[in-house]
Structure formats: C-alpha cells, structure tokens
Curated annotation (Swiss-Prot):
NCBIfam families: S20. Belongs to the bacterial ribosomal protein bS20 family. One of its GO terms (molecular function) is small ribosomal subunit rRNA binding. This is Small ribosomal subunit protein bS20. It comes from Cytophaga hutchinsonii (strain ATCC 33406 / DSM 1761 / CIP 103989 / NBRC 15051 / NCIMB 9469 / D465). The gene is rpsT. One of its GO terms (biological process) is translation. Signal peptide: none annotated. It holds the Pfam family Ribosomal_S20p. PANTHER family: 30S RIBOSOMAL PROTEIN S20, SMALL RIBOSOMAL SUBUNIT PROTEIN BS20C.
Length: 85
C-alpha cells in the first residue's frame, strides 16, 4: 500500500479515470454493435455520424489510438456504403 499522501491521491484519480474510460469505451462499443446490426441505410448513416464522433472523442482523449479510431471509422463507413438504399 502507498505511504505518501500524493500516491494515495494518484490511486484514487487513476481509478476514477479508469472507470470513466471504461464507461466511454463500453458505450462506443454498444453503438458500433447497433450500427453493424442495422439494415436500413438511413438509420445506419445517422448512427455512423454519432459513432464517428464518439471514436474521434476517444482518440482525442487518448483512450484509443488515433489510427485505431481511423481504422474503425473506415471499416464502418465501408459497411454503411455497402448497405442497400
């Protein structure tokens, strides 16, 4: 166990950040699953806009790497474009 006051504070802060990051990742994953499950192009386009923003936000906050976000957005865009109108 940590002995210093600052170390104890870091433990608390890291735990809070971990929980926040986990929540944001889980929410994004859920929306990605919804997007992949959609069959109507109009709905998929709306969801894609939302998911794209979520991925960008995760990358901006260093929760995921920016290239990881770009790859996911690219694959999702391909998926949406393949859907029949």
């Amino acid at each position: 166990m940590a002995n210093h006051k600052s170390a104890l504070k870091r433990i608390r802060a890291n735990r809070a950040k971990y929980l926040r990051n986990r929540y944001q990742m889980k929410t994004t994953r859920t929306f990605v699953k919804r997007l992949r499950a959609s069959t109507v192009k109009a709905d998929a386009n709306e969801l894609y806009k939302k998911v794209s923003g979520m991925l960008d936000k995760l990358a901006k906050r260093n929760i995921i790497h920016k290239n990881n976000a770009a790859n996911k957005k690219s694959k999702l865009a391909k998926f949406v474009n393949k859907l029949a109108a």
